[in-house]
Amino acid sequence: STYGISQQLLMVGLVLILFALAFKMSAVPFHFWTPDVYTGAPTVITAFMATIVKIGAIVGFYRLFSVVISFYTTYNIILLVISTLTIVLGNVIAATQSNTKRMLAYSSIGHAGFIILGITVLSPSTTYVTWYYLLAYTLSSLAAFWVFYLVSEQAEQEEEISIFKGLVK
């Protein structure tokens, strides 16, 4: 018993917090909402969700689990499985999409897996690399959504990936 809280109750609380943060980061198996919401929301809101909301969840995840992982190695194994599944599923499904926003959504899921993996390993060098990766992900996502917004304003089929044909000539 720590501070009058049983060990089992503490574990249940940590699992529930993990689930909530995994949902906000769009990690497998809590990723199902992301493609539908990204597709249905205006591009500016989608860019906000893909960057700012995800950063908030990742910072919360890091703050909590940088302490917890050192005490509970079971969480480390669970997070390695979650991050691996998130990377594979996000990137494989992203490669099959014809809708640009859905592709960006699944790509965002894959990137979340890489970030979770960096936090899970949690050594001093991976911490810096993870924050650098998060910065690079944020800037590239903002650029991708900005280009999508500019191109889709001129296109008839505004969300299909075919609108980018001839963009680099």
Specify the residue positions occupied by each region the protein language model found.
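Alpha-helical transmembrane segments of multi-pass membrane proteins predominantly involved
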Residues: 1-169
